[in-house]
Design a protein with these regions (language model features):
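Acidic carboxylate motifs that coordinate Ca2+ or other divalent cations, activating on Asp/Glu
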Residues: 41-45, 65-69, 90-94, 114-118, ...
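EF-hand Ca2+-binding helix-loop-helix modules
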Residues: 2-5, 20, 24-63, 74-88, ...
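Bacterial N-terminal signal peptides
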Residues: 10-20
Length: 139
């Protein structure tokens, strides 16, 4: 009996801890949204358009390109782009992302995060899971 109670308690605790991690991630994305707008909103309209996001992504690409060869390999984007996303973003299958391929991924995520399809990302839209992935590509 004691062992069964212990196991049930441990499983419940793991569930609560897991829920806490999800909540912390959601809170971090929520807190980052206004900062992202403030940092990259060049026309001061309180939203990010695709041009603003691509400009930020282009600069971030250059920072990630440690060997300055104009492409990003899996090692250079470790922690930024997961292996499956990297493979999907590499249509020529050469094992690297050119700036055009990187910006195409950025545009794809931008369009997915733009839930009202107005061509901009509001602070609210920047709280989504997709926008959190987009943030890693621009900041």
């Amino acid at each position: 009996m004691l062992n069964k109670s212990f196991i049930v308690g441990a499983v419940s605790l793991c569930g609560l801890l897991g829920a806490g991690l999800v909540s912390q991630s959601a809170l971090a994305a929520t807190a980052a949204a206004p900062d992202l707008v403030a940092k990259y909103d060049k026309d001061s309209d309180q939203t990010l358009d695709l041009a603003e996001v691509k400009a930020a992504a282009s600069a971030h690409f250059d920072k990630l390109d440690k060997n300055a060869d104009g492409t990003l390999d899996a090692k250079e984007v470790q922690g930024v782009i997961g292996p499956q996303t990297f493979k999907a973003a590499d249509p020529d299958n050469d094992g690297t992302l050119s700036k055009d391929e990187y910006l195409a991924l950025v545009a794809k995520l931008f369009n997915k995060a733009d839930t009202d399809h107005d061509g901009t990302l509001s602070a609210q839209e920047l709280k989504s899971k997709t926008a959190h992935a987009l943030k890693r590509l621009i900041d």
